Amino acid sequence: MSAPQWFVPVKAGDAKVPAYYPTDDMIQEQKKKLRTRKGAKITALDKPAWNLEKLRKSIVPGAILIIVAGKYAGKKVVFLKQCIKSGALIVTGPFKINGVPLMRINQRYVIATSQKVDVSKVDTTGVDVKFFKKIAIKKAAFGKTVEEDFAKKQYEAKKALIVEKQKQVDESIVAEIKKVPYLKEYMASYFTLKNGDHPHLLKF
């Protein structure tokens, strides 16, 4: 049996042992194994959260939801997909019909209806946590700085990206909404309750 490459012979009676052994051959073997890995690189945003909230059975892509709390309470939105990092629902009015933009909302603040819209052709690529992250512009104490100018450019670029994505999503969804009679008027109307109405007994 031949000795390994890193083996260093020691004379009889010599108790001195080298402190380090050459490991170049081992490192090369490890690098070869790393190169053989296949598949696309998975980033942190592509991995779903370990505690991702499960959606109700009635909340499926394309379902029309009624917002019951917040700034847009009473308005209807179309559910696009679930954010894999926060578990929030990504919805849109669409903005062209009722003024509700692309936004995130928790499922506890919506009521799902039986009406659905085909959203298979809607491109939601890039609409994730990073898409909704706000860019804060902090003014320096002594006038403008390079960092402030750079932040403003980032803010304008982000704003243009959001507007362009909103137009793209609205174009696809509005086309599907127009296929269903009176659905456009339904999406534009507010949801209200009258005296004697019980939400838990209503069928949406």
Swiss-Prot record:
What CDD domains does this protein's entry cite? KOW_RPL6
Which BP terms in the Gene Ontology apply to this protein?
cytoplasmic translation
One GO CC term on file: endoplasmic reticulum
Q: Which UniProt keywords apply?
A: Cytoplasm, Endoplasmic reticulum, Ribonucleoprotein, Ribosomal protein
The record describes its quaternary structure and partners as: Component of the large ribosomal subunit.
A single Pfam family it belongs to is: Ribosomal_L6e
Subcellular location(s): the record lists: Cytoplasm, Cytosol; Cytoplasm; Endoplasmic reticulum
PANTHER family named among the record's database cross-references: 60S RIBOSOMAL PROTEIN L6 (PTHR10715), LARGE RIBOSOMAL SUBUNIT PROTEIN EL6 (PTHR10715:SF0)
Query: Which InterPro entries does the record match to this protein?
Result: 60S_ribosomal_eL6, Rib_uL2_dom2, Ribosomal_eL6_KOW, Translation_prot_SH3-like_sf
Entry's family note = Belongs to the eukaryotic ribosomal protein eL6 family.
Using the UniProt record, give the first listed, main subcellular location.
cytoplasm
Could you cite one Gene Ontology molecular function of this protein?
structural constituent of ribosome
| Known role | Component of the large ribosomal subunit. The ribosome is a large ribonucleoprotein complex responsible for the synthesis of proteins in the cell.
Tell me the protein's name.
Large ribosomal subunit protein eL6
* The organism's taxonomic lineage, starting at the top: Eukaryota, Amoebozoa, Evosea, Archamoebae, Mastigamoebida
The answer to whether the entry has keyword Metal-binding is no
